[in-house]
Amino acid sequence: MAKTNLNDFDKIIVLDFGSQYNQLITRRIRDFGIYSELLPHDLSIEKIKEMAPKGIIFSGGPNSVYDKGALKVDPEIFKLGIPILGICYGMQLMSYDLGGKVEKADNSEYGRADIEVIDPNAVLFEGLPREQYVWMSHGDLVTKAPEGFTITAKSKNCPISAIANDEKKFYGIQFHAEVRNSEYGLDILKNFAFKVCGAKANWTMDDFIEMQVDEIRKKVGDKKVILGLSGGVDSSVTATLLHKAIGDQLTAIFVDHGMLRKDEGDQVMQALNKDLGVNIIRVNAQERFLNKLKGVTDPEQKRKIIGKEFIEVFNEEAKKLKDVDFLAQGTLYTDVIESGTNTAQTIKSHHNVGGLPEDMHFELIEPLRKLFKDEVRELGEKLGIPHDLVWRQPFPGPGLGIRVIGEVTEDKLKIVRESDAILREEIKNAGLQEDIWQYFTVLPGIRSVGVMGDGRTYDYTIGIRAVTSIDGMTADFAQIPWDVLSKISTRIVDECDHINRVVYDITSKPPSTIEWE
């Protein structure tokens, strides 16, 4: 049976106590095929009852339960008959609220720790080795479990590493099962989701598409929608989903600022407009953007100018359209979480990169606001967007404008665009495109002496940046084979004008960022 709203899916909710890993918990549960949301720690009991989750997870957080202003839950939550898993601070809070004892640890644990499962019947550890390593990050610990709880695991510095009350289906783990540094963390979460909560894996992208198409049609009716199309994955998927729902009632305004990767604008038009039928107005505005950027070298100023100009071009085109009621955006669930709100809004001034004039009144529509980035990519493929377009690497809004260090000119953009295309082609030829998180070229504005033929040259240097990462928060430089780097370097020098040197950035993040500007 088709799902028509989120209440039709089994769900496990995560209450937010401030941990840096909160989004990961939600992601892991969704990866199991179970719908999950990250919600405020003080979510009302009435709202929880309305959502009817199969389980609740208390996240970790930086507080001590004894801190003034420490984040708490309504004690009534323990009377709902819903299974609860407390992670790190979540375990401490549950223990404290139910009569256990929490104290400051003599030896705080930050990093890898070895635990031993001491209860052979512990459901969270069912089917897992007795000894395993986990990721700890805590300054307090539970020193006495609440009445009715058994201790199920211990470590050298944390004698109560996991607790269980099977009768009430309350469980606690002092470590972070959601991070990959915990050896069997995902299995522990699976045991909670399926064996304890009895949740069904019925969260599918096909159902989401049907649900969203139905919601969009009900909301929009016979009215018109506009969308600012950047050429990126999020706005492209938003456009395609809206087109599936309302067809030509959608007009996407594609502001081509002339700082996209090689052939990228044409690829977007081919895939979305010609192949999928999305109604797109393409505005070729490179000259306009370059005029505004003339003489500007500060990276933050460049970003602001590009963002402001994007909005102005979008506004001019939007005003040409008549009787438009809705503005669509490619807002993702990560944006919703970071903004601290989960409520829809009607706007007068709103856009991804700036604000619309006060005299433009639109109602906001955000069909991707419940999805993470990887889910958006899956959705894009389901909607028929080409794989290469859906799986393009992260690309900054200002585009190549911040990969030209210093003043941006048409000639410099051409150098970066051509060198970047060579890098991509050779990485793909070597079969490395799925192994490297992100890779691109940079024009640092450095000139150096070289020799080409019988003559002396004094030309630009190209920098290659390639990194491996899991989430982009930290990154290591990619160890590309020397023969591949050699071929890339040779081709860039031979095929790109005004380049006589290629260097490879071997700095990790931190201390460097992935982008140079």
Swiss-Prot record:
- Keyword Nucleotide-binding listed? The answer is yes
What EC number(s) are associated with this protein in UniProt? 6.3.5.2
Pfam families according to UniProt:
GATase, GMP_synt_C, NAD_synthase
The family database entries (InterPro entries) matched by this protein are listed as: Class_I_gatase-like, GATASE, GMP_synth_C, GMP_synth_GATase, GMP_synthase, GMPS_ATP_PPase_dom, NAD/GMP_synthase, Rossmann-like_a/b/a_fold
Which domain of life does the UniProt lineage start with? Bacteria
- Ranges for domain Glutamine amidotransferase type-1 come to 11-202
Which parts of the sequence belong to the GMPS ATP-PPase domain?
203-392
Q: Which EC class does it fall in? A: ligase
GO CC, sorted alphabetically, is: cytosol
Reaction(s) catalysed (UniProt annotation): XMP + L-glutamine + ATP + H2O = GMP + L-glutamate + AMP + diphosphate + 2 H(+)
Q: Which Gene3D superfamilies match?
A: 3.30.300.10, 3.40.50.880, HUPs
The pathway it acts in is: Purine metabolism; GMP biosynthesis; GMP from XMP (L-Gln route): step 1/1
Residues engaged in binding ATP: S230, G231, G232, V233, D234, S235, S236
Does the keyword section mention ATP-binding? yes
Task: Give the keywords, sorted.
Answer: ATP-binding, Glutamine amidotransferase, GMP biosynthesis, Ligase, Nucleotide-binding, Purine biosynthesis
- Which residues constitute the catalytic centre? C88 (nucleophile), H176, E178
GO MF assignments: ATP binding; GMP synthase activity
- Subunit structure, per the record? Homodimer.
Provide the function of this protein.
Catalyzes the synthesis of GMP from XMP.
* Protein name (record): GMP synthase [glutamine-hydrolyzing]
- Species of provenance: Lactobacillus johnsonii (strain CNCM I-12250 / La1 / NCC 533)
Recorded name of the encoding gene:
guaA
